[in-house]
Amino acid sequence: MYIDCTAVKGENTSFSCGINIVSDTTTKITKLNNSDFSPFPLSGVDENGDYYGYSIIFRILGAPTADAKVLVEHVITANTDIETEGQITDSANGQFTFVISKEDTDVLGLGKFPIQICLVDENTLENVYTLTLGGERDEFSKVQIVQV
């Protein structure tokens, strides 16, 4: 997963995205295309018949390092305010919306900032997966704050 987005300072901006995984992990694929991916469900029933569910912690970091200071953080669930925080919009297909608010842009100022997305247990908020890198060169996902 790789996100490269731009928000305008002083405005609320929402972004929609989905989490996809490689469908066939048994075959070595050297060049992936869209048909090689399938949605990663954010809730469902596992092979043992147990329910699972994820919430998302969306963070904007001060630097592209694992121990970077967290500048902005939003916990995103199926019930959070889609206008101010973001929301899981289609859990079965791994789709969600995140928001960079006017207040977030005031905290961040202008520039590019790395993004970290954590899939956490929806009940305990314990980290299960962390998504930071993507793109063809495994770059940090990022948001750029601009002024118009």
Identify the meaning behind each predicted range.
Residues 1-148:
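Contiguous segments within soluble domain cores/interaction surfaces
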